[in-house]
A protein has these predicted regions:
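Juxtamembrane inter-helical linkers in multi-pass membrane proteins
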Residues: 94, 248-256, 299-302, 424-427
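Soluble extramembrane regions of membrane proteins in the secretory/endomembrane system
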Residues: 26, 33-218
């Protein structure tokens, strides 16, 4: 009878990895031939040219150059604090046509007639309907004179916002003082508002009476429910039966010898990683403080000259990625000799050095780029691309790709010459690292300058993000965790391989194709709404099985030593804590189209990120530190017990942060967006200068409550940071 034991998981994982990239490059053809056009020029009925297609393209480039998308957002994509430039521009233009927030609060025939009149004034029509990758600018758009006056008002507003008011709203003082640059940036913002009015964004951003969700948004949500129920019924039954069968397979236990001096060098990278985690946590607190005090740091003025909000945010999320990556690179160097691949001292220093220098380059490059210390055109290459999350200079993404491919090669060698029991796991790791490298390289494109069209940029940006956090990173983490369970005798090798292989196939397939849920509102074709709704929800399947598997491990017991108990504890915290963060507040909730429509780019995304990243990825990575230090003689059994308590406290800190602060803020934003529109949920002021959401008393209270969870998580981090640095000099030998 054919069973999981007969499956060549490495081959299936490779097929999945190749298939998802083939699918995405195939679908790119349809997407890039059905993009909203960038008009050659936009003119008023009176004959005045407002802006040209080149202005729109240059405005997008300038927005990236000044780091504006790490402060505010465009069509909801970008920062969670600063204003949404699309909805603010739309609101300012609509106000010139007679729209106001109070107009939509009163439901009567007179108001409906007025709203219809405003719709006619703001109507936008593109001819031709679509443009292509080979011809971005096409056609001429004629708008009303009221629209033209609204554009002028928006230019005046953003001239003050990015100029004289910049420091007071959390940006570098007088960030943009060139009026022509501001006009081009506003041309880009206005174009995004125009494609929303013309129906290219499935009715986003919500503007009551003017821009509202399309029927496809509701239909795609119902399709999600149907597919998810069918998939769960079929997959859950089959997988659980097979897992029960494999549970009876014989277990092994491998007593690993103490690491040699070269392996111990990897602990240097881990020590730097825990330091990076600590700094990232401090920056997270600083960023949240800016929500309610954007101009100063507890009264200290001038801070925005060296660490404005967009710089701090960029450093914060980059450190979240970098401490993980440096840890994985270090653990690879530590583990590869056990898997059959000899690492020389020179190799170890070169790989670690390349990783650390790349990380430092990313951080310094972003800081210098957003503060305008790097001249044109080099900011895109060695500074920051200015794209949210994928903000790393293109050179650094290429270096990350090369490093990932080199490690992939080493694990491929391990899959050929290593111990029989570890070979299939090494093969999965090799494929996952290769896929990560491809994703990083895609993120570096077009290498020397930004993509001219927003839709093209978003298409490739999200492929890179999902290649990391949703597609190829889960197989890296899960495979390492399962391999630790196998080698310590907790689970049978056959079951461990089935878990790692099945998870890798499902994560890569659903996670990569599930990228489509980021194509709901950005101007991509409507078909992505259905693809994203289905596949992003199916992302919950492998995570759901991992939660169940974690519970089974914990319930089964039979753990005989402290290392086994520590591994299972960390995996349980990661599986349950992180899995719930992904399923409850990610694939299973906020990715459903009708829900995502109202909370896209809100603190709801922060709930998802602040539970999924530190718990699903952070906790297993911290386990890698502990295992490496334990095998090196740095920690004994008593320390393992302390770390088990610390990791539970660490997870508790993030859940307290989410439930006391981030979730109430999400609910507040949901209430505001459904009442007034998307413009109302970000910013410290309204488009017409009134008090914004971050100035509301209840919102300030919720922001302050995050401090409790931050402190609890910080205490737990200190339990790892201090002993790791104290033990490091005793176990790492730098010289022969």
């Amino acid at each position: 009878m054919y069973s999981f034991k007969n499956i060549e998981w490495g081959r299936l994982v490779l097929i999945a990895a190749i298939l998802v990239y083939v699918v995405y490059f195939g679908m790119a053809y349809y997407t890039f031939t059905h993009m909203p056009p960038i008009p050659d020029e936009v003119v008023t009925k009176g004959g005045r040219i407002l802006f040209t297609g080149d202005d729109i393209i240059q405005g997008k480039i300038l927005a990236q150059k000044y780091g504006l998308l790490d402060y505010g957002s465009v069509l909801g994509f970008g920062g969670y604090f600063g204003i949404d430039y699309t909805s603010y521009t739309l609101a300012i233009i609509a106000k010139e046509a007679g729209w106001s927030p109070t107009l939509i609060q009163l439901k009567n025939a007179s108001n409906n007639d007025e709203i219809n009149r405003i719709r006619e004034i703001l109507a936008v029509s593109f001819d031709p309907q679509y443009t292509t990758l080979l011809e971005y600018t096409k056609g001429r758009v004629v708008v009303s004179d009221d629209f033209g006056r609204g554009f002028d008002a928006a230019v005046n507003y953003f001239t003050r916002f990015f100029g004289s008011k910049a420091e007071s709203v959390g940006l570098k003082p007088n960030l943009i003082t060139d009026n022509e640059s501001v006009r081009k940036i506003v041309a880009f913002f206005t174009w995004t508002a125009m494609i929303a009015l013309a129906g290219y964004t499935n009715g986003f951003p919500y503007m009551p009476g003017l821009v509202e969700p399309h029927l496809d948004v509701v239909q795609a949500t119902w399709v999600t429910f149907l597919i998810f129920i069918i998939a769960v019924m079929i997959a859950a039954g089959y997988i659980m039966i097979k897992f029960i069968d494999l549970w009876r397979e014989p277990r092994i236990r491998v007593d690993l010898p103490p690491p040699d001096d070269v392996q111990r060098l990897a602990l240097l990278g881990m020590a730097l990683a825990v330091l990076g985690l600590s700094i990232q946590g401090l920056l997270g607190g600083y960023v949240m403080h800016k929500y309610t005090d954007p101009e100063t740091l507890y009264g200290i003025k001038g801070i925005n000259s060296i660490l404005p909000y967009n710089v701090a945010r960029g450093l914060h999320y980059n450190l979240a990625v970098l401490w993980l990556v440096i840890s994985w690179v270090s653990f690879s160097l530590f583990a590869l000799p056990y898997l059959g691949v000899r690492i020389s001292r020179r190799q170890a220093f070169l790989v670690l050095g390349a990783g650390v220098l790349t990380a430092v380059g990313i951080l310094l490059g972003l800081w210098a780029s957003y503060l305008r210390l790097i001249p044109d055109p080099y900011w895109f290459i060695i500074g920051s691309q200015g794209r949210p999350v994928i903000s790393q200079g293109s050179l650094y993404l290429i270096l990350i790709a090369v490093l990932a491919w080199y490690l992939s090669y080493l694990f491929y060698k391990a899959s050929r010459i290593g111990p029989e029991v570890t070979r299939p796991f090494s093969k999965i790791l090799s494929i996952a690292l290769a896929g990560t490298g491809v994703g990083a390289f895609i993120g570096s494109l077009p290498i020397t300058a930004p993509w001219p069209h927003f839709v093209v940029d978003e298409y490739f940006r999200w492929i890179t993000i999902h290649a990391f956090v949703e597609g190829f990173w889960p197989p890296i983490v899960v495979t390492i965790m399962v391999l630790l369970l196998v080698l310590t005798g907790v689970v049978p090798p056959a079951l461990g391989l089935a878990v790692a292989g099945l998870d890798a196939v499902l994560e890569i397939a659903t996670g990569m194709i599930g990228t489509a849920h980021h194509y709901y509102w950005g101007g991509q074709p409507t078909m992505w709404l259905y693809v994203g709704a289905v596949f992003s929800t199916l992302e919950a399947l492998p995570l759901g099985f991992l939660i169940a598997y974690s519970l089974i491990l914990w319930r089964r017991g039979g753990l005989t030593n402290e290392l086994q108990k520590t591994i299972v504890t960390f995996i349980t915290v990661a599986g349950i804590g992180g899995g719930v963060g992904v399923i409850g507040f990610g694939a299973g909730l906020i990715n459903m189209p009708i829900i995502n429509y109202y909370i896209h780019g809100t603190q709801g995304t922060m709930v998802h990120a602040h539970l999924a990243m530190p718990l699903s990825y952070g906790v297993p990575t911290m386990l890698m530190w502990i295992v490496a230090f334990y095998l090196s003689g740095g920690f004994g059994d008593s320390w393992l017990r302390r770390f088990r308590y610390a990791i539970v406290v660490f997870a508790a800190g993030f859940y307290i942060q989410a439930f006391l602060s981030l979730m109430p803020l999400m609910i507040k934003q949901f209430s505001l967006v459904t009442s007034f529109g998307y413009w109302s949920i970000k910013g410290i002021e309204t488009p017409w200068g009134g008090i914004g959401i971050w100035e509301m008393p209840d919102v300030k209270t919720f922001v302050g409550l995050r401090f409790i969870g931050d402190v609890i998580a910080a205490i737990a981090i200190a339990v790892f940071l201090i002993p790791m640095w104290l033990k490091l000099p005793k176990i790492v030998i730098l010289k022969r």
